[in-house]
Amino acid sequence: MDKNISFTLKVWRQKGPKAKGAFETYQMKDIPGDTSFLEMLDILNEQIINDGGEPIVFDHDCREGICGMCSLYINGHPHGPATGATTCQMYMRRFKDGDTITVEPWGSAGFPVIRDLMVDRSAYDKIMQAGGYVSVNTGAPQDANAILISKDIADEAMDAAACIGCGACVAACKNGSAMLFVSAKVSQLNLLPQGKVEAARRAKAMLSKMDELGFGNCTNTRACEAECPKNISISNIARLNRDFIIAKLKD
């Protein structure tokens, strides 16, 4: 059975996008080790509300590692020290009694702070709107086996599609680049027959939108790959670069 721990929590508080933020310190006592990180924040918020304060604003939805909403920078790592897991999948047993835990929002020009730990990640939606889809005529769908796809290609596309768009890659990158996200979303479509028709347009449009929204350039430090909760490979970035170069040569 996991032991209870007590620790110091330093949380970034900021009232709005243009307000000046600062860390506030809270003492957490006897938190069970099997408490998830977000449940711990729920406990803290209940204490703050009972004391008449403003609860900490943070993003969450499914709490199952699927939606990508729980975007917290914990002790210098996107989603915390756990590998291959989102914030909501991390439990307090990963920390020691007496630890100091620092919690911040994603730090990137592409993800401005809304309030406290919540950031605006709508830039990702805009990138997807630029080309993260396959244009089709409406009508009855084809049978699943109508277009044969080799297993190795299907596996690569599925691995790329595992990206949940959380933004950890941007938070981890010293340049604030969204290349891992963009390359995963381009790859999951460009690898498949249905996506190849628009492959050139997709690569150019999504990269152009990424640059327009203020994300930085990729310099291959691989921090994004190391911190990605879904273990997305930077081989997708190499594929996107190839697709982009080929597309520009065809212009």
Protein language model regions, located:
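Eukaryote-biased recognition of intrinsically disordered, low-complexity regulatory segments
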Residues: 4-27
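Ferredoxin-type iron-sulfur electron-transfer modules in oxidoreductases and energy-metabolism complexes
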Residues: 35-54, 101-251
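Long, hydrophobic/aromatic-enriched structural stretches that serve as scaffold segments
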Residues: 53-54, 69-73
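Glycine-rich phosphate/adenylate-binding loop and adjacent beta-alpha elements
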Residues: 74-98, 103
